[in-house]
Structure formats: C-alpha cells, structure tokens
C-alpha cells in the first residue's frame, strides 16, 4: 500500500437547521448528516461522543442519523429535497452545487468554520493483492501488462475525483505537461477499470469481497478498513 497524494481536504458545514444555527437546537432532537461513502465508521464514533458532550453542556438529548453514498450523488439528493441538517462531503464543488441550486447554504460557507470548513484531510493509496503479484508500486505501473484497476465513478464519487486528479497530477509531472500524453495515460487507466461503482465503499466491496481487479485506488482509511473487514 503506497501513499501517493497527501493533504486532500474533506469539507463539512451546517445547513440552516443544524445545531450551529441560532435557536434550532432546542426544537430539534434528531439531526441528519448527509455524508460520503467512507465516513460511516468515523461518524458512528463521532456522533456518540458528540451526543454525550451536547447532553453534558445543554441537558438535551440529540440523535444523529446518517445518510451515505457517493459525494456527488449525495449533493444531488440534498438539492432534490433530502432534508439534511449537516452535510459532510468530499469536494468543495459538491457543496457549491448545493449553494447554487438550492439556496440551503450560504455562499460564504468556507469562512464559517476554521481551516476553510475542512476539518480533516486524507490521502489516496493503492491497495494490492497479497504479495503484490503484479508489482504495482507507482502510477506508471497501473497501465502495464494486464493490470486491472478498481476505482469508483468520478461522476458520482468524490473519492473517485481525487483518484482522477491524483492520476492527472502524476502524469502532468511525468510527461512534463504534455496534454496529449497526459490524456492518453488517464484514458488508458480508465480503460482498465472493469467496473465503476457509484461510491468508494462499493469499489472496496468489488475489490476485496468480489475479488475483481488487481489494485484498488482508495482513501487511506478505506484501505485499512478493507484489511480489517475482508
């Protein structure tokens, strides 16, 4: 497993009904956090800790419910009417889409919380089969021989877009900005993807449980989860 691109921001913010909105907490005992695929385990623990802290500080009980899926798909669900109280998505553009198409979030959302409303970061890694039989160590190895790649669909998954951008960044450096070579590399990479799941968790299942592909492109925490679960 090789780290390839660090410092990827994950953006989070409160919608108009969230606990951070003045006067809303007293009337609300349930919150819905609409998040992307890989945060299930994170927020399961975080929500429990938050509920205890909120109870200690205010005397009120709060229940936090979760909705998970590809980041872009989740943004579309909120735009189409899913009543989220908080969204924690993988891309700034997904939150900006909610701003532009629903009016549920203020345009200046990035300035509302510290670190441009990006509370944590992650990185993209390669997860390979035991013993690394295809000898995959870097981006160039992904387009050698008969290597098959598992990655989500960048049209619906935030993590998939980071995978795409990481591949593009590597190719840009490798080919010294030659756009034709960069496009050819990225195109060849995606030709080697036998399936494009809508979200990163689906890709993890495809690789680890269904045993499809030689390498999984994933968030670092998702790679660790695959090792523990499968």
Model-derived regions: residue spans:
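Sec/Tat signal peptide C-region and signal peptidase I cleavage site
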Residues: 21-27
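Bilobed "Venus flytrap"/periplasmic-binding protein-like clamshell domains
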Residues: 39-45, 154-183
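Bacterial N-terminal signal peptides
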Residues: 3, 7-20
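Cleavable N-terminal signal peptides
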Residues: 14-15, 25, 37
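A short secondary-structure junction signal
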Residues: 137-138, 160-164, 227-229
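N-terminal segment of the mature folded domain
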Residues: 28-156
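Active-site regions of metal-assisted phosphoester/phosphodiester hydrolases
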Residues: 13, 151, 166
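Ligand-binding pocket segment of bilobal, Venus flytrap-like solute-binding proteins
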Residues: 175-230
């Amino acid at each position: 497993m090789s780290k390839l691109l660090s410092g990827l921001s994950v953006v989070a913010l409160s919608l108009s009904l969230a606990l951070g909105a003045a006067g809303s907490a007293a009337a609300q005992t349930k919150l819905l956090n609409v998040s992307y695929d890989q945060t299930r385990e994170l927020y399961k623990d975080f929500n429990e800790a938050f509920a205890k802290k909120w109870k200690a500080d205010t005397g009120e009980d709060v229940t936090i419910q979760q909705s998970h899926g590809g980041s872009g798909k989740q943004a579309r669900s909120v735009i189409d009417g899913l009543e989220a109280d908080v969204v924690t998505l993988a891309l700034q553009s997904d939150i900006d889409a909610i701003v532009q198409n629903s009016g549920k979030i203020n345009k200046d959302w990035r300035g509302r919380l510290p670190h441009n409303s990006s509370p944590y970061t992650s990185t993209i890694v390669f997860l390979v089969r035991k013993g690394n039989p295809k000898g995959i160590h870097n981006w160039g190895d992904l387009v050698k021989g008969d290597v098959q790649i598992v990655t989500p669909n960048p049209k619906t998954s935030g993590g998939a877009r980071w995978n795409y951008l990481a591949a593009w960044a590597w190719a840009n450096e490798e080919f010294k900005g030659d756009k034709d070579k960069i496009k050819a590399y990225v195109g060849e990479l995606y030709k080697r993807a036998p399936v494009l799941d809508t979200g990163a968790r689906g890709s993890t299942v495809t690789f680890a449980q269904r045993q499809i592909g030689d390498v999984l492109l994933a968030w670092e925490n998702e790679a660790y989860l695959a090792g523990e679960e499968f």
